[in-house]
Amino acid sequence: MHEYIRKSLTIDCEAVTNYIVERIREYLEFSNKKGGVIGVSGGVDSAVTATLLAKATDNFFILLMPSSSTPKIDLDDSFEMIKFLNAQNKYKLINIDEIVKSFSNKIETENKYIIGNIKARVRMIILYAYAQMLDYLVVGTGDKSELLLGYFTKYGDGGVDVLPIGDLYKTQVRMLGKCLGLPERIVTKPSSPALWEGQTAEGELGIDYETIDSILYLRFDEMRSEDEIVKMLGIPIDIVKKVDRLVKISQHKRLPPEIFRLSGRAINSDWRFPRRWA
């Protein structure tokens, strides 16, 4: 990673931790909910988010929702996080294979991408069922890199109430995980949704996260041109254009459903519900 980017993305771990923990507390109070439910996958994003949630409130519940495509190491690391958070009485293990098989059989598909999205959406349904039972919010685990790239399932892992690490790039999440004292194996593990066997984020995207984060930061935080990024990072312009395109074509994933404006007070375009009523 270019030294300028490394310095720019370096975070004050204590300050970031304190800020996010306080914001979680505030948002739970504002939402009039008792706590948060979270899915833990064994990856760094869910591990960091679960740790921050546990620091914010004692009222948290963890769901482990493996499938046949979940690597054993991910399930092992999920249980490692249960121990790390002393949450032996605050979790539930639910294998989703039978539910996913029922869905895929009904729609008569063996397409791995469709089935992968079904898996993500089944997990969302389970999270919200537990959230309703417990009167909790669903706490999402997406980071800024994934959100910008659209590397999540709409109404799947993207279907949540709050995204505590949504303004941290993947490399920053790893920094924070290290500062929080998470197991090294989890902090450094290659990211993967594990929606099918052998899937890795970097393999699917074709670019490593250090390069992705460098491009995203320069392009969308500093508003640099493609040519400037190519010159600074010394990478082919095709890679910069690919990242740029992924952000543009996934914009619909980051927005609420489009409402076609007919009146002078259309929701979202003319009238927005305030975060807090005065």
From Swiss-Prot:
Record CDD domains: NAD_synthase
Keyword Lipid metabolism: no
Pathway: Cofactor biosynthesis; NAD(+) biosynthesis; NAD(+) from deamido-NAD(+) (ammonia route): step 1/1
Its biological purpose: Catalyzes the ATP-dependent amidation of deamido-NAD to form NAD. Uses ammonia as a nitrogen source.
Positions with a binding annotation for ATP: 39-46, 141, 170, 192
BP GO terms, sorted: NAD biosynthetic process
Enzyme Commission number(s): 6.3.1.5
UniProt-annotated binding residues for deamido-NAD(+): 121, 154, 161, 252-253
EC top class, as a word: ligase
GO terms, molecular function: ATP binding; glutaminase activity; metal ion binding; NAD+ synthase (glutamine-hydrolyzing) activity; NAD+ synthase activity
Full protein name: NH(3)-dependent NAD(+) synthetase
UniProt binding sites for Mg(2+): 45, 146
Recorded superkingdom: Archaea
Keywords from the UniProt entry: ATP-binding, Ligase, Magnesium, Metal-binding, NAD, Nucleotide-binding
Similarity remark: Belongs to the NAD synthetase family.
